[in-house]
Amino acid sequence: MRSLASDTPLMRQYHAIRAQHPDAVLFFRLGDFYEMFDSDALHVSTLLGLTLTKRNGTPMCGVPVHTARTHIARLLKHGKKVALCEQVSHPVPGELTQRKVIEIISPGTAVEDDFLSQGFSQYLATVCASDATVAFSYLEVSTGAFFITSFPRAEAADALQKEFGRVQPSEVLLSASVLRSLPELAAILSLYPRLVRTTGADALFNPEHTKNRLHHCFRTRNLDCLTLLPHSPDLAAAGALIAYLEETTRHPLSHVSAITRYHIHDFVEIDDATRKNLEILQNLHDSTHAHSLFETLNYTHTAMGTRLLRYWLHHPLRSQEEIQKRLSAVVFFHHRPHILKTLRATLSCVRDVERLVARVALEKAHGRDLLALKESLRAILTFRSLERESPFPPDLLPSEGDTPVLQELYGLLEQSIKEDCPVTLSDGNLIKRGFSASLDELHRVRDNANEILKQYLAEERERTGIGTLKMKYNRMLGHFLEVSKGHLSAVPAHFIRRRSLSNADRFTTEQLSELEAKLARAREGLVSFEQELFADIRRTVCSHTQLLRTNAARVAQLDVLQSFAHAALQHGWSQPVFIKDGALRITGGRHPVVELHLPSGEFVPNDLTLSSSEHAVLPRFALITGPNMAGKSTFLRQTALICLIAQVGSFVPAEKAELTPVDRIFCRVGAADNLARGESTFLVEMSETAHILRAATRDSLVIMDEVGRGTATEDGLSIAQAVSEYLLHHVRAKTLFATHYHELSRLAHPQLEHLKLDVLETDNTIVFLKKVTPGSCGSSYGIYVARLAGLPESVLARACELLKQLQQRAGSAPRASAAHEADAVAQTEAVHAHKAASKPCAQRVSADLFTQEELIGAEIASLNPDAITPLEALTLIARWKRSLRGSATQQSSAMTKRKG
């Protein structure tokens, strides 16, 4: 290998190319390897676990060309960019091979499956600003989806934070000037440490430059049709994205055919804290989609549908008309389960048409991509047959005008592409026999050459007398003759030895070399012609890019709507009814996720009625008290989720739900330290609370849990009451406010309702009923919950003593519930060990609604038999017998009175 000293021509070439791409890892092609040098080698070898070597003091590492895609994908997941530098001239001895970067791959510019996550969008976003307006735009090059919005400069900080949280781009393209003019942007970006940031030259955002790029991309001189506002940052934002992507992909973006303009107020505003607390797309435990709302709703069968479902969950609708359009389609499928079943089976045959079409347009599609497109077209064409039984809702199936074109494309791909074609185009074997007469002729020549090789082998067998003489082929030697060790003495002089093995030797001859050269020329001609035909087929498909993208979008929407219908059938959900009186009425509401992970029938449904109207007799503020573990947080979250699910356009987990669309959903439930930003739990809690008080409107839904818990009791109580009063008197939003500050129960207002989570106390046992009823709860039963958590009995006893002392100092007698707790500690021999928690949800409502037998049954259901001793079990049985005898006596007495 030539010297790698920095003054060699090769290294000068490397450094010159590297300087053009300072923010990317340069994959520098050297023969069958991509090499990395200097700082790239040091960094990548550590990141990917590659072997680091040195040549003439220069650090280097490399990966084979055939495994490079795997390593590039790993780098992208680490948030890196890769500049792919290829050899663009044939190597000539003594001359430096020409090289250039043919593509820049980054999380926001990737288009090939190896570099993408199925079901996830990977957007490239940008921000541009003028003195009065800020534009936010994002584009997914792998599908062609392109969006833009703008807002007044004064609203930029809040609006940008919401949009970055909602869109969650993979990469952001910014100019240095916008970072200077929007100092708040740096703080927003710091919230997303994994977001790849690319700094573009200010010239990239120049209005004239971007306008020309847009004219070229959309093939129009009139940009009004693109919904871009003249004399605004819109042009710079949209044009910069197009320009940057054309530079990185080294190809026109013919599949990007429209820009969707939206207004941020078209959708329900959900901030990052609320999105996290409601576990909409990922859970709080390990940040996966397990046990999330997304998992509960996701019965999609296509990658396109999965991405659209994520988008819809990030963008709940505010328009009743738009929500109703979706609901009408869900109702259609919900009421026709036989059609739904057939539709779901057909959708399972549809591949990722959006990304397939993008690769076709960017000339990156291979034979198997076109086969996947063919199978998808076949499935899409069968959708129309489902309409024979019942007309589908509009805009979900291919139009009658599109059908002939789709059939024509399907026919072209069916006739042309071989089912077993390879991924690599240079391997050939792409096109079916019979598609092209010229190609068939080349096949005939190649096949004849094979016959000639067979004839030559027969002649050599006869000439040498070696009946076991074989002809084989590999990439290293080409065609060769193989002679076993036992026949080497019969090898003639014109055999030229190529390789010796343990059991055979390999030879060639001048005649075989000539025949092989003829075969190679025929094969090269055939592969070259196949590639030309394939390129023609791909161009034909590309000419219908817009039609294919339109129908792919319809399929994605169809997939999500059928997913909603299937979820409703699976989970027993009902159709929400939208009203305009500002009310929220939920009957038998359930938590969509918690319910599914409990045994069937165990979740306790609850009702709720709220209104934001000033003149309504209905409450708009519900103050909720109840013990720990009683189900307050579940009730709070399920209310928010029911509203969100309804405004996405789905059925909801309730017997009945009537609601007026909300404009914002806030959910402040729990908090944690933000150590990286130097913020304590209480500061995080207060920051979230302040945001809600500033941003909530009368049309919002506010969920707040345990405000003020992170500081001293007096401070926390004061803050909780002040926040409650502000929400009630000034914000006037529909509010659920859960608290352990039972002193707040004295609050009164015509539109304030006190709700509590019921608790059943029987002798020495406490059962959390999970049922929401009017009234206030006098205790949090903290010591009882501490017992369930397994605190030592001595600690529990001491806690009861201290509780009594604290209450006596406060000048009040211990509450009845506190006495029960102390009594429970004192009677440890008569009570089972509460080390194992009761079932999280039990189907019980209130003590006065149950017979003694049912109450005992509830207590038995809450027991963990592995956690009680035989003596404790006998004690329990004795108590139950006494209770049953007492119950029988009461019933007998009641019967006697009635007869009398």
Swiss-Prot record:
Pfam families attached to this UniProt entry: MutS_I (PF01624), MutS_II (PF05188), MutS_III (PF05192), MutS_IV (PF05190), MutS_V (PF00488)
Family: Belongs to the DNA mismatch repair MutS family.
Gene: mutS
Organism phylogeny: Bacteria, Pseudomonadati, Spirochaetota, Spirochaetia, Spirochaetales
Naturally occurring in which organism (per UniProt): Treponema pallidum (strain Nichols)
Keywords, comma-separated and alphabetical: ATP-binding, DNA damage, DNA repair, DNA-binding, Nucleotide-binding
Name of the molecule in the record: DNA mismatch repair protein MutS
GO cellular component: cytosol
Coiled-coil intervals: none
Function: This protein is involved in the repair of mismatches in DNA. It is possible that it carries out the mismatch recognition step. This protein has a weak ATPase activity.
GO biological process, alphabetically ordered: mismatch repair
HAMAP family in the record: MutS
Gene Ontology MF annotations: ATP binding; ATP-dependent DNA damage sensor activity; damaged DNA binding; mismatched DNA binding
InterPro entries per the UniProt record, alphabetical: DNA_mismatch_repair_MutS (IPR005748), DNA_mismatch_repair_MutS-lik_N (IPR007695), DNA_mismatch_repair_MutS/MSH (IPR017261), DNA_mismatch_repair_MutS_C (IPR000432), DNA_mismatch_repair_MutS_clamp (IPR007861), DNA_mismatch_repair_MutS_core (IPR007696), DNA_mismatch_repair_MutS_N (IPR016151), DNA_mismatch_repair_MutS_sf (IPR036187)
Residues given in the record as ATP binding sites: 626-633
